[in-house]
Amino acid sequence: AFEPYYYEEFGAFYSPYSYKDGDTIRSIQLGRKDYDYHYMDWYQIPKLLDSPYWSEPYFDEGGGDMIMTTYSYPIYDQLGHMVAIFTAVLSLEWFAEQVNSIKPYPNSYNIMIGRGGTFLVHKTKENILTETIFATARQTNDEEFIATAHKMVKGESGMGEFERQNQRFCFFYAPIKSTGWSVAVACLHSDIFSSVNNVRKYSYL
């Protein structure tokens, strides 16, 4: 996505965009008057920060027409002037599938939160982009879980425990430093320690 009139012949909104459609790579011209990308976060923020930037997930109406996150990388000319933003987009649905494919135990589930605590990945799809980990933590009335939620947003890593629907979970979390997000896996306490209990049981025989 180029700065206005960098190429005079292409006008103010030159932004060639390629995407995969099945087994075919298609290309379109994304920029236009009713889709002025120069004022969108994925363009403005890396330009202002003068550095690469991962956007918070958003619905890109008129562009990708899906919920996605964008990695933006500023491009400069020989004089050091920024002339364009190179982007790569990830479908949030696809990204969630990759995260959810990691299951240490049959009853495990994963979550991922954005910089402000909004769920980006959650086992309940209705919670994605509409609910925060803070709201969920308050519903449990579990002080340890509430403290863990704040630690995740601060970019810390660690382990916590919480109880939900009369089941005790262990909660392992770590930051994704390049994005400012945090990912966690929740595992049933009984699943984790069942193998330990089995070893103890056989050691007594």
Residue ranges, per PLM feature:
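Selective recognition of signaling/oligomerization transmembrane alpha-helices
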Residues: 203-205
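Conserved beta-strands of PAS-like sensory domains
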Residues: 64-103, 121, 170-174, 180-195
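Amphipathic alpha-helical regulatory segments at dimerization interfaces
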Residues: 45, 97-102, 148-151
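Amphipathic coiled-coil/heptad-repeat helices and related helical stalk/stem segments
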Residues: 38-39, 95, 144-145
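Extracellular/periplasmic juxtamembrane segments that couple receptor/chemosensory ectodomains to their
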Residues: 76-77, 115-116, 135-201
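Extracellular/periplasmic ligand-sensing ectodomains of membrane signal-transduction proteins
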Residues: 1-66, 119-141
